[in-house]
């Protein structure tokens, strides 16, 4: 039987030092858990949490795009690393937050890091959040964005024909 105690991530020396500092700050936060807050209070707390740590944003070209697919209108934020052309590898990014929390500003650093480190274009899906949007709106928008991106990969990828 293994009797070793798990190491708390905020104290684990194998966890990157900035991440440990962030986790320690998170663990020391006072107040009720997010799930006990109203949607507005939870969103405000999430924004405050994300903006409480300093952020070095990798340079990127940012484009906001609204697309129509399968009868739905979906807002996208396209993050292209500097030097990356329009045609090329791309990935879709669906943020977490239980379809209620999060948006591009609260995920921008992470999305830019992924795009910069991979050299790929990120297509951030700004799906409608609950409770304002009823189930399954966000899932349908995510699927429509996926189909839009997939259809774009079949295009000629010339001129303005970019997914």
Where are these regions (language model features)?
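Short amphipathic alpha-helix adjacent to the substrate-entry channel of hydrolases
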Residues: 105-125, 140
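Short beta-to-alpha linker loops that shape the active-site pocket of alpha/beta-hydrolase fold enzymes
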Residues: 126-130
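Short beta-strand element of the alpha/beta-hydrolase
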Residues: 87-97
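Short helix-loop-beta connector
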Residues: 85-86, 157-159
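Alpha/beta-hydrolase active-site loop
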Residues: 133-155, 161-163
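A glycine/proline-hinged amphipathic helix-loop "lid/cap" segment
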Residues: 1-81
């Amino acid at each position: 039987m293994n009797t070793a105690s798990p190491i708390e991530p905020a104290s684990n020396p194998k966890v990157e030092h900035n991440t440990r500092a962030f986790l320690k700050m998170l663990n020391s936060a006072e107040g009720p858990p997010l799930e006990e807050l109203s949607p507005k209070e939870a969103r405000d707390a999430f924004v405050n949490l994300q903006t409480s740590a300093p952020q070095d944003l990798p340079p990127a070209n940012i484009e906001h795009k609204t697309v129509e697919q399968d009868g739905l209108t979906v807002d996208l934020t396209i993050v292209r690393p500097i030097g990356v052309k329009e045609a090329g590898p791309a990935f879709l990014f669906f943020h977490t937050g239980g379809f209620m929390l999060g948006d591009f500003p609260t995920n921008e650093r992470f999305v830019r890091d992924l795009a910069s480190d991979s050299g790929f274009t990120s297509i951030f899906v700004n799906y409608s959040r609950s409770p304002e949007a009823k189930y399954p709106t966000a899932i349908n928008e995510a699927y429509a964005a996926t189909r839009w991106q997939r259809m774009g990969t079949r295009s000629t990828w010339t001129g303005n024909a970019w997914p």
